[in-house]
Amino acid sequence: MITCISASNRHFSDQRWQQAYWLFSFSDYYDSGNVRLGKLRILNDVVVQPHEGFGVHPHEEMEIVTIMLSGQMTHTDSTGARVVIHSGDVVRMTAGTGITHSERNLSGEPAHFLQIWIFPDQQGLLPSYQQASFAPIGFVGKLVPLASGRGHAGAVGMHADAAIYRACFQSGFKVDYAVGADRSALVYVLSGLMTVNGFAVEQGGQARVQKEESITLTSTPDTDFIVVDVAAR
């Protein structure tokens, strides 16, 4: 089953210092029918304005992946980490037994990123942090694993049966991706237009995949997109 959701049907939150789309129930948005997709709990598409950000706040028992699309954010947390996350960087934070952190845009330009929350395979993990950098040219014509609990080389690790990919396809490029009938996946289009098993998905749109052995991803104009592959339960 493939469910397509248009860009206009995302929940939009404008807090002056932050403009964001919540793809699932989060913060000021709640829909009992849109809380999660399998082990995927959150996918937020966020812009933080210059010299703004998130103050110190806690998390626990969640794998949190940040994909920096443009700009930069400064991350500090209770493990002692203080790092700048630049465009092209991917970060995995294991909240585990409990972590506090802050994220602020200390630059003079807006920061645009995706934040993805996935339920971990086990409870009680020690909090940890991992960061990796990816060059945009590497996404052309292939699905590149950014974060993975399956041991993909070059990806940040996750304590979850999940993988997050990014790809940039030129017009007409097509690839088959094996999902598995016992898994779920979400395809989110960052720019361009594509089809998922023939269903059109525009910029800002998404396709939610359940109980499908495989999907065919085809770009029509050039397309930049991510795939989040998770256990269904």
Predicted feature descriptions by range:
Residues 1-233:
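Jelly-roll (double-stranded beta-helix
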